[in-house]
Amino acid sequence: MVPPAPCLWPGHPIREGWERGRRAMARRTRPATLAVTRWLALRLAAWQRGDAFDDHQITPQVLRSLEVATHCPITGRALQNDACVVPVDLRRGWVAGNLVLVSPQIAERWMTIDWELAKDALARAEAEPETQVEGLPLRHWRRVVALKSLATPLPHDEAGRLPLHVLPPNRIRLVNPIQELQAVLTLQLAVPGWGQRARSLAESFPEALRTEFNLFFNSLLAQALRQGHGDMKPEMRDALAAAWGNEVVMRRWLRVTALVDAALAETLVERLTREPMPGLYVVRHGEVEARQALAA
């Protein structure tokens, strides 16, 4: 692999390192994979901006796991080989659990969009839904805010008021307990067998919460099933994300969140993730930290 042209001037540290590497690895002919190419591009970009980059947490293997995404979470368009990895929460930067794959068009402006700017842009877009704000339509700003909120530490009440316009991408670490609960409940409907699990889901909740949970869960399912028809019928994950834009779903979700504090949300997520779901693997934050401590 050849570094970008601006890095090939004589005396440039990237060129010097590249030339030393070529001499040391002259006999190696194995081509770089797409994940390795992206990893090197990330390291170079972080170095050029002076950003911290955790070599232990971010590896080509981690980036390869992001490639399960087939569509940009913001535009909804199919991702190609030129898709870019960006940090969800800019303040946390290049760390595992804070990375997502997006289209090049979104990546170009993503590094200038922090949480406050995203919220402000969404408010302006909501006020003028037919007008693009900062070059993006209302539906895209809703997804930007939804995605950024998942990796941005927020007050419990604020996190609980946000609709899940984007389901959590692979490998993202959700930092707000109420959104963990929101995501786990939504994902229950994204995999087969939800009908058999519905009763045990309700039983996981305290008795005082079960009625509100059932009203919310049934509303979310009904709205997801109403999304599109025939050839326009979306995949269930996309249908669930769209269902979160429904006023009835949000109103019933807010009734649930009014009765669930952060501690109870964590307890419920722990209960709900004990049983595996087909094709879905949920790792709790505490489990990750414990494994890292054992490996240290």
Model-predicted segments: where are they?
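Alpha-helix initiation/capping motif
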Residues: 37-38, 46, 59, 95, ...
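Generic surface-pattern signal
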Residues: 68, 123, 127-130, 146-155, ...
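Polybasic, low-complexity binding patches
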Residues: 88-100, 108-152
